[in-house]
């Protein structure tokens, strides 16, 4: 019961900040013109600062193997998610090719950053949050390399290496060796305080933009038409995938910090970023929104159940 209360405590701010972004858009405080600049600040400044604040001085990341295994697990989870979701999209006859690709991309990738980071930070120690950030590098690589095959590759003129080297990935590539070399021990206190303050802004601001995006698309989407799309996404993302994640965490002797990360990621709904990609490139925004919005709403009930079950089963 205590664990369930902690999980709800970690979840509630996330949902309320998203709601705040939704309201801010609807009442006109946050317009669409501001979205791109805000996300640029989050992705290129605040989120890298967040990464530095959790990686530097993190003893759990001093071992080089900890910089290899978590990203590998994260990458494999997304590759499997995309592959299974595409196969099922075709079997279930979700729609035309464009809609199947969007369904596979949206269902195959979970909300790997904005939701799990505050939950992990509250339920586990600082070292586990660091492992989560390293794990997410593998997710990013899979999303940009394999994911673009569903939505981006035909239209994005940038070469693959430019898409892979996002600011968060660069921050990981710099901060991990700095942590190995214990450079943090030679930095002044004001540098850490500045990085920490910037990093604390990343998640709230990103969630506000997510809420605003929901507000934009919710008015146009016909949520209760073609119910096989959201229902299939809920079954795949919030039932089948969590069971698979927890099963592999149970049978494979991963470190406890990585098992904790796998558990939290297992419970996550579909990611929001596919909505933005489908909106800008050759995807179906309606399919992406149905998948993301439905799994996000349902996850409010399923996240505590899966995390509570996994904590006991994995003895975390």
Predicted regions mapped to residue ranges:
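Alpha-helical transmembrane segments of multi-pass small-molecule/ion transporters
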Residues: 1-316
């Amino acid at each position: 019961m205590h664990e369930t209360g902690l999980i709800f405590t970690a979840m509630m701010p996330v949902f309320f900040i998203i709601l705040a972004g939704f309201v801010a858009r609807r009442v006109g405080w946050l317009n669409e013109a501001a979205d791109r600049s805000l996300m640029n600040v989050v992705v290129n400044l605040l989120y890298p600062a967040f990464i530095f604040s959790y990686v530097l001085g993190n003893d759990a990341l001093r071992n080089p193997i900890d910089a290899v295994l978590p990203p590998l697990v994260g990458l494999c989870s997304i590759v499997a998610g995309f592959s299974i979701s595409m196969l099922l999209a075709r079997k279930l006859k979700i729609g035309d090719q464009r809609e199947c690709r969007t369904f596979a991309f949206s269902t195959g990738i979970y909300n790997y950053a904005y939701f799990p980071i505050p939950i992990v930070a509250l339920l586990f120690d600082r070292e586990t949050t660091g492992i989560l950030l390293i794990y997410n590098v593998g997710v990013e690589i899979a999303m940009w390399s394999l994911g673009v095959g569903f939505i981006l590759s035909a239209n994005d003129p940038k070469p693959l290496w430019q898409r892979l080297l996002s600011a968060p990935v660069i921050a990981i590539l710099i901060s991990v060796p700095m942590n190995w070399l214990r450079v943090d021990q030679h930095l002044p206190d004001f540098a850490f305080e500045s990085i920490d303050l910037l990093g604390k802004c990343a998640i709230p601001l990103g969630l506000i933009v997510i809420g605003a995006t929901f507000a934009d698309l919710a008015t146009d989407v016909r949520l209760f038409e073609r119910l096989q799309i959201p229902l299939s996404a809920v079954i795949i993302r919030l039932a089948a995938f969590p069971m698979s994640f927890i099963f592999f965490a149970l049978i494979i002797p991963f470190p406890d910090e990585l098992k904790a990360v796998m558990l939290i990621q297992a419970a996550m709904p579909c990611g929001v970023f596919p909505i933005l990609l489908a909106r800008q490139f050759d995807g179906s925004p309606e399919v992406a929104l149905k998948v993301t919005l439905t799994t996000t709403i349902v996850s409010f009930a399923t996240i505590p159940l899966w995390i509570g079950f996994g904590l006991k089963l994995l003895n975390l």
